[in-house]
Amino acid sequence: MSRRFALTYENKILRKIIITVSIVILVFIATGCDSVQNEVKDVTDIPLNSKLDSLISESIIAWNQDKLNHTEKQFETHVIYGTEMKDEKMYVYLHSLMQGYNRETQTVPQAGHLLPVRVTVTKNGDDYIIEDYHEPGDGAENEPTLRNMSPNKYADQALAISNKIIQSLESRMQESVSKWLEETNNERQER
């Protein structure tokens, strides 16, 4: 009888262990799914008016014009990690995809970058002024300079940029390029 009790007791312990492990695994799976969703939400749901968003794109292209002067048309799209206000200045932390194109090469970019950027913005009445554009150093200097120019929460996001976000940026870029090519083709046909 004591042997039967021992087996039953061992079975109960084994059953409790299996249930506990299953619950822990489910919690990890659920938490993992939530963190991915939160990462995307944090990246895409930061409010920024379209006027400022357009100005940021135009300014990034202007700051990098010397790198793209051999291309006919330049485009920039970005994902914003967040903003901070300090001393009447807004610091915008983002990941920028900028590329230059020629009609001859169609949708094949001729130059560009994909990198984290900090843009410093001030407001003058209803207008925004881009005061500064800062990107991290290359190679071994990349992470230290990124962490120096950005809060850790934004630097961490930039260093762990997902393929989903990169694909989203590339998709938006291709939409803009295709629209430009279509417009330039229509202009040529009207002549």
Regions from the language model: what does each represent?
Residues 9-19:
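Bacterial N-terminal signal peptides that target proteins for export
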Residues 19-27:
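Hydrophobic helical h-region of N-terminal Sec-dependent signal peptides
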Residues 5-6:
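Acidic, low-complexity, intrinsically disordered interaction modules
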Residues 29-32:
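C-terminal motif of bacterial Sec signal peptides marking the signal peptidase cleavage site
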Residues 76-77, 81-139:
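Mature extracytoplasmic domains of secretory-pathway proteins
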Residues 138-191:
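C-terminal partner/receptor-binding element of secreted or periplasmic proteins
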Residues 35-96:
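N-terminal export/targeting and maturation segments
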